[in-house]
Amino acid sequence: MTITYTQAFAKNFLGNAPGWYKIAILAFLIINPLVFSLSPFYAGWLLVIEFIFTLAMALKCYPLQPGGLLALEAVFIGMTSPEKIAHEVAANLEVLLLLIFMVAGIYFMKQLLLFVFTKLLLNIRSKIVLSLAFCLAAAFLSAFLDALTVIAVVISVAVGFYGIYHQVASGGGSNVALSDDSLLTDSAKRDALDQFRAFLRSLLMHAGVGTALGGVMTMVGEPQNLIIAKNADWHFVSFLLRMAPVTVPVFCCGILTCYLVERFSLFGYGAQLPDRVRQILLNFDRESTNSRSRQDKLRLMIQALVGVWLVSALAFHLAEVGLIGLSVIVLVTSLCGVTDEHLIGKAFQESLPFTALLTVFFSIVAVIIDQHLFTPVIQFVLQSPPDRQLTLFYLFNGLLSSISDNVFVGTVYIHEAKAALESGAISLKQFELLAVAINTGTNLPSVATPNGQAAFLFLLTSALAPLIRLSYGRMVWMALPYTVVMTLVGLLCVIFTLEPATQLMSQWHLLTLPPAQDVLSSGL
């Protein structure tokens, strides 16, 4: 059937996105110039709301395309300038290098990470202990590595194990699609598969929350952490210590929540690994171990040594984070024999789309700065007493981060806090406390929905999610106990423990305040 050019354009525009979504984006593109001609301020806020909409609808269409169109139009109609965007990108180069090189570097260490999570899954029989181990392992890894990569590894383990059992249970071997359950005629096998799905769902959610618990602690745990650390002129250890009054109690309560939901089988947790599934997986792992060559074993040892280098280099701030990631790429690929250009190129596939999206974030940030969009909000917050400022920043960040991407939210608020410092509206001490409130408020409540955490969104959009019946609603439900506990404990710590604990660490000379002019000159 022949279609018109109009129909062809409608099909091509934003690909497989729903028709209503395409119409909405076109309406935004038409309305924005009209509103801008009447009021640049309201047009700017409209753009921010539209951009948050594209982030919230990430499952309908990846936000790079619709968000990029909105940002491109904003430049054309004069809401910001290419020079301003270039300045924001240049100022955040370290973050871009983190996403490009660190994520790619960890890609080449996947064998080691797969080995670790596989041994955890098969050697720990208690589901409670296993859940705690997955949560703790994900938290530790996310404190030094990108959370997206950690979740990608856990997904790889889960897909592999699901495929092994599904092929054996269906009796069709590798020719049967993992989504095809038609050959599972035995009710016992079907029941075991359903239980296995629930088991994998709970482990993946524990690991996902673990990435948030660990990722909030360090400057490399999440991209926005690095932006906040750069503005405050904090290095790895100082960032870790300044966050500790909030992140350590939240971490402990998060681990306690993990125990309770498993112990009492709440919110979809508590499913055990069926015995027949465990036996099949153990047999497969035994065969894999026996067939592992000395070359394979040496690769694992090399990756472990490079992991030690990575942690040490980050802890002692031996170089910029992105450059440390590049060193990981060079060391692992050269010592493990990965020299094919196409194999190396695959390592960058996960990070580059998000890197491009982050650049679009910076375009929207440029609009916010040029149009002074957050000035009324910041003035409202700054008119409050200093202790209430921390609470309001935490709550505003948390609310937005639960429905929008936390990198975008964190970037916007730390820019506004930095502007308040430079104008003399707040003191250096208050700015540093606000930076902690912004970082924790951005990271902790964002586990509420997949929109806030890139790792959660990656899990939801992965090929594994439909196999284990992990829907958007189920993900929100399973994250609910963690959301409530982490958000409330974080808020209480910001109100009651942050300032006295920071003062105590200063008295112990664990923290030192840099000269105000140094902080001002080192920001973005």
From Swiss-Prot:
Segments spanning the bilayer are: 23-43, 44-64, 97-117, 120-140, 144-164, 203-223, 236-256, 304-324, 354-374, 392-412, 448-468, 476-496
What does the UniProt keyword field contain?
Antiport, Cell inner membrane, Cell membrane, Ion transport, Membrane, Sodium, Sodium transport, Transmembrane, Transmembrane helix, Transport
Iron in keyword set: no
Superkingdom of origin organism: Bacteria
Catalyses which reaction(s): 2 Na(+)(in) + 3 H(+)(out) = 2 Na(+)(out) + 3 H(+)(in)
Q: Which GO terms describe its cellular component?
A: plasma membrane
Record localization? Cell inner membrane
**Could you tell me the membrane topology recorded for this protein?**
Multi-pass membrane protein
Q: Which GO terms describe its molecular function?
A: sodium:proton antiporter activity
Specify whether Protease is a keyword of the entry.
no
InterPro entries (UniProt xref): Na+/H+_antiporter_NhaB (IPR004671)
One protein family per Pfam: NhaB
Concerning NCBIfam families, the annotation shows: NhaB (TIGR00774), PRK09547.1 (NF007093)
Q: Say what the protein does.
A: Na(+)/H(+) antiporter that extrudes sodium in exchange for external protons.
- Name the family the entry cites: Belongs to the NhaB Na(+)/H(+) (TC 2.A.34) antiporter family.
In Swiss-Prot or TrEMBL terms, this protein is called Na(+)/H(+) antiporter NhaB
State the organism named in the record. Edwardsiella ictaluri (strain 93-146)
List the gene name: nhaB
